[in-house]
Each structure stands twice: as C-alpha cells, then as structure tokens.
Amino acid sequence: GRFGGKYVPETLMHALTELENAFHALATDDEFQKELDGILKDYVGRESPLYFAERLTEHYKRADGTGPLIYLKREDLNHRGAHKINNAVAQALLAKRLGKQRIIAETGAGQHGVATATVCARFGLQCIIYMGAQDMERQALNVFRMKLLGAEVRAVHSGTATLKDATSEAIRDWVTNVETTHYILGSVAGPHPYPMMVREFHKVIGKETRRQAMHKWGGKPDVLVACVGGGSNAMGLFHEFVEDQDVRLIGVEAAGHGVDTDKHAATLTKGQVGVLHGSMSYLLQDDDGQVIEPHSISAGLDYPGVGPEHSFLKDIGRAEYDSVTDQEALDAFKRVSRLEGIIPALETSHALAYLEKLCPTLPDGVRVVLNCSGRGDKDVHTASKYLDV
C-alpha cells in the first residue's frame, strides 16, 4: 500500500540499498541461516514454549463453564527476557557480514538496548546506545546492564527525551558514520528495508506457533493477540498467519490515561497518516501535522508512530486494533502474576488486559494465542509505585 518507503537524507540511500541487497543475499545463504539458527537455539534458547495458561483460562470461564482456551507464546523465556533478541542477533550477524564493526541502536524501555549490547558482547562489536534522558531515569537498571555488557550509553536530552528523540539521534549518528556503522533498529518501523527485515527476523515466533499448535491440538490458533508499540512482537506472531483468513489478528495499543485525553500512545486507534523516521505510517499528530508526544506507563509502547505493515493491515481490515489504559495494564500485570506465576512486562500486560474485553465475546473452546513478549522484572519498580499488593 502507501505505507513504508524511504524518506531519508540522500547520504543514507546507499546504506539502505546496501543493507537490502545484503539481506536478500543472506536470506538464501544456507551458511548464514545455519549460523543464525544455531545461535537462536543455543544462545537465545529457542524454541520458546507455547504454554497453556490453565488458571487464566479458568478465570475467564463463564458461569456455565464455557469460555476460550488461552495459550501464551513464551518469548519472555528467551535470553535477556524478551522477543527483542531475535532481531538483534540476526542484525549483528548481518553487520559482521557487511564488515561493520561499530553498532548503534536506539532504545526506549532499554530492552532493545540490552539485547543489542548483549549481541555486541557476543560478537565482539563496538556498541553505542542512544536513550532518552527521561527513559534512562525510568529504566536505570537497564542502563547499568548495557554498560555492564560493554556498551556506551548516550543520553538524549532533546524534545521529551524519550524514544522518538533517541531514534532521531541514532539516525543522525548513522548519517555521519555510515561507512563504518550498522544501525540495529529495534522495531518494524523506520525506512525500508528495516520494517521488512525486522519482521523477517521475528517471524520465527509465528512459525513456531503454527508448528506447536499443530502438535498440541492438530490445528491453528483461532485468535492471535499481541501488544503494539512499534509492532515488532505482534508482526513476528501475525506474519505467518496473515494469509489464514480464519485466524483473527488483534493488536493492543497503549491508551495511557484514555484515548480521549492527550496522554496515550494509541497510534492506530487515533492517529493520522504521516511520515516519521523515514517511513509513512499512522502517527499521533496535531492539526498542524506536528508529532504529538505519546504517553504510556510502558516505556516500550511510548512511541508516536507504528510499523507501516500494521498500518496496512489496519487499512485493509485484516487486523483489528484496540487499546487498554495504564490502569488496565497494571491490573493485568498483577492478575497474571497471581494466576500463573508469570510476571509479564508492562508492554505484554496491555495484551493480557485486553483479554478482559475479548474473552466474554468468544465462543466456547476458541483457542487464543497471546504473545508473552517479555518478562516484567524491569517493570517491578514502576508497578510498585501504583499497585497495592
């Protein structure tokens, strides 16, 4: 569709073309695929389990004992505790093939930064992470983790000092050092080929899910649910099933204080089409087309744009997008911790919170697979300020 593209300075066009060519070459390179699969298995710990959430399923049963069956795709069990590592590992290998020794990345919650620092340590690459000063405060432990792993973390003070500003700063660095540097973008956003590339490196989530579902119950999931910030974990789960018209795809955005306030990050629910960070997509913008600062209790969903492919899936009606508030996410954070002994990331908690709306509408025995995109260790401090336990 009209989404995506390469709205970037001339200096980056060559790098993007080089990247795209390298990506296509490696996609059919058995040696590269073998190396990547080996690392995903032995270092990341794939495949991740498809787990039947028995007590959560019980919780959503109606009075007559009917209700959906809820499964969690356990990306929180990957090395470093989130889906982010899938993409980081693959892009680091790609950078090595391109002969680039210097890696830069942007990070919001710090998860992508930690994943990038992790793979740079693993492959012996120089690592510079751009992070908004405000996010550095919110996620001090992740800042320490990145430094511990040998990365240099650069604070970004411009704008609201959050993810959007960190991304702009990382792009600036890349323009200046494009010959020596590979930019590991952490979501399905940014200029082509990034959205496609990041999706391809995460589609292992959906591929495993199809195989595991077939093994567990001899069919497909009926409904897929995932949280959406930029949208990489959702795209990783959805992509495999886009052609399966009988599988519902549901993305859950951050409604912050509510979608009718000015404090939310529900881009697909409330945004208009515009250009940010090199690609055309839905964006949160004011009447003058200026990007509005998003808000979410979850630093990883706090982004004013969204991946172009999600914008496309929304427009053609293939995927549905809804949103849940900070409070609903916090309630789910506690609920799932209590019911399943799984402390989910606040990002993931948005998807889990949506079960409150979704489950009452589903027929008996419908199989829901929810992408448990990350673990909540990083969010316990934030949650402790709001939750009474």
Swiss-Prot record:
GO cellular component terms, semicolon-separated: chloroplast; cytoplasm
Entry's transmembrane regions: none
Gene designation: TSB1
One of the Pfam families matching this protein, by short name: PALP
Biological role: The beta subunit is responsible for the synthesis of L-tryptophan from indole and L-serine.
NCBIfam families linked: trpB
Name of the protein described by the UniProt record: Tryptophan synthase beta chain 1
GO terms classed as biological process: L-tryptophan biosynthetic process
Functional pathway: Amino-acid biosynthesis; L-tryptophan biosynthesis; L-tryptophan from chorismate: step 5/5
